[in-house]
Amino acid sequence: MKLLGDSSSSLLLSLLLAQLHLLASAFPAHPRRIQTDFDKLSNQTRHLLKLTQDLLKNPVFATEIDHQRFKSLPAISSRVSDLTTLEFKPTLSQLYADLKSFEHHFEWLNRTTRKQQHSSVPKLTDMISHIKSLINSLQRQMTRAEAPRIPVPSPSLPPNPAFHWEVVQSSQELLQQFRLFCDWASRVFLTLKSKLPA
């Protein structure tokens, strides 16, 4: 009986040691997986940047605009020095809030261009789809990091444009601001990745 008890204890100890070994070997891979996720976030943002740049190549946007129709677009801080002072959780939360704001603005623009039967409708629909995908990816990282969600206020949108040139100006302003955001956000994601444990 004693021999049986000793054998059972040895077997249990062996199983526990095996499980601990598996956990220990799996843990170092976790930071690498998170780093890969941040590469994905940066790549998704760069893809959105390219979509925005392609839309802005349209000759209709060649004219400079000097007034602001959108009062609630996120303020973009694009100083290189700001990258060195980023805090992980607050930055994720702010990027999420900014993306949600741009999503609301682009959905408004998409509805407006549909009414005007504008040629950019298919590309705007594609862009909104990619924005939603980036938001979902960012949400997953926020959940892992336990980053809080900042309340996103309802956007202050301009009146529905009555003329084609108003649609053009609204599109141009929104795309130019989003181009700045995407360029900044892609740098931010790479900076945050560098702050992760190796």
Can you describe what each PLM-predicted range is?
Residues 2-84:
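Leu/Val/Ala/Ile-rich N-terminal alpha-helices, chiefly Sec-type signal peptides and the beginnings
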Residues 30-58, 64, 89-198:
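Extracellular/luminal segments of secreted precursors and ectodomains of membrane proteins
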